[in-house]
Structure formats: structure tokens, C-alpha cells
């Protein structure tokens, strides 16, 4: 490779990096105006804001949201993301699944949450990353014979029987809550997730869950 060609390639790389950085800033600006995110691991996106944004920017934000909330290591194919976004923005579909998430359209909002039950993450018996989405730990100690797995609707029923509730998002659909982590001893729920506020389960056990996907929704 000649020195001149190497210089041209270097200049091209620098230019592309700058263009990508500018796109990332625009995605972050759109997210600030269009995205409402809950620490329970679901999001709402303003349809008017997405429709008014440049298509490449709207696509990036939607793809980032699906990837983070779906919890999968690899993002869904871009052509599938584009098709899904076109369908819900146009109103062709009001509900679809993509990348481990459920996307619904209601009035002027898209809602995105984890599709529980389609694929099951490995159960956790010690602190760590669960379902590619949440960092979890148990305080004040991890009870013997317990493991972290999906809350599910049975977990919600047991939690409500204990007079407990998941905070801080009282507006979350039950499908969102069912996709959260719960601490189980066989078929008995020991604790639901403590998210931003302490809500202990049996014997004061608290399952702390912090939404922390490998790649954040907002790029900066």
C-alpha cells in the first residue's frame, strides 16, 4: 500500500467516525424527547417524535431500545428492525415481536418490553447478570436452595398475596412485571425485585435488580 493510499484511507476513517459521532448525538437528542424509560426494563416511545425524525435516526433509537430490552447478546437484523418499525409507525400492526421483545402501539405511543416465556435465561444461584438485562444480588444473604428466575404471573400472584408490590412504576403492564426477576425456592416466591426502593420479601430478603444491558439505549 502506498503512503498516499494509506493517508486517504485514514482520512476516510476519520470522516466516517465523525459522521457516526454526529448521528449518535442526534439519536441521544431524539431519545431525550421521545423516549420514556422505566427501571423495570421497559420503554415508551413517542410516535409523532419518531415520525418527524430522520428515518436513520428513528431506526437507530428503535433498534437500540429493542436490543437493550430484549436482553440478547446480538441485536436483531437491521432489515427486521426496519420492517417492524415501518409496520407499527404506519399502523399496519399494533402488536408484534422482535428480538425477544413485544412492541405494541397504543394511541401515540409505542411500548417495548421483554417477551417472557419465549426463551428462558439460565437460573441464577449467585449474584450476577440475569437475562442479559439485570444485575442482581440478594441482601442481606442469599438463602440456600433459592434461585433467580422469571417472576411470571404466578410470582405476581404470590407477591400480591404477601401484600407486596413492585415499585416504582405503577403504570407498567402486568406483562412487564411478569418478565422481571424473582427469587424462588422451588415453587414458592421468596422475594420480588427491589428496584430503586426496598421492598423486602420473606424474612426481610431483598432481591436487588438494576437494569444494565450490555449496550445502553442512549448512546451518550
Protein language model features and the residues they cover:
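AMP-forming adenylation/ATP pyrophosphatase catalytic core
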Residues: 2-220
Amino acid at each position: 500500500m502506498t503512503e498516499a493510499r494509506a493517508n486517504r484511507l485514514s482520512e476516510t476513517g476519520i470522516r466516517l467516525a465523525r459522521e457516526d459521532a454526529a448521528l449518535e448525538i442526534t439519536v441521544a437528542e431524539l431519545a431525550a424527547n421521545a423516549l420514556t424509560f422505566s427501571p423495570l426494563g421497559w420503554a415508551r416511545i413517542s410516535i409523532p417524535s419518531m415520525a418527524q425524525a430522520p428515518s436513520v435516526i428513528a431506526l437507530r433509537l428503535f433498534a437500540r431500545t429493542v436490543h437493550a430490552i430484549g436482553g440478547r447478546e446480538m441485536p436483531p437484523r437491521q432489515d427486521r428492525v426496519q420492517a417492524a418499525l415501518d409496520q407499527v409507525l404506519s399502523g399496519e400492526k399494533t402488536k408484534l415481536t422482535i428480538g425477544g421483545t413485544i412492541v405494541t402501539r397504543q394511541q401515540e405511543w409505542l411500548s417495548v418490553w421483554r417477551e417472557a416465556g419465549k426463551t428462558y435465561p439460565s437460573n441464577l444461584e449467585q449474584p450476577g447478570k440475569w437475562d442479559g438485562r439485570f444485575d442482581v444480588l440478594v441482601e442481606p444473604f442469599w438463602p440456600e436452595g433459592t434461585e433467580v428466575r422469571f417472576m411470571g404471573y404466578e410470582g405476581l400472584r404470590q407477591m400480591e398475596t404477601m401484600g407486596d408490590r413492585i415499585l416504582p412504576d405503577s403504570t407498567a403492564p402486568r406483562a412487564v412485571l411478569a418478565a422481571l426477576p424473582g427469587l424462588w425456592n422451588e415453587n414458592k416466591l421468596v422475594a420480588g425485585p427491589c428496584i430503586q426502593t426496598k421492598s423486602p420479601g420473606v424474612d426481610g430478603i431483598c432481591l436487588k435488580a438494576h437494569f444494565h444491558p450490555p449496550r445502553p439505549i442512549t448512546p451518550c
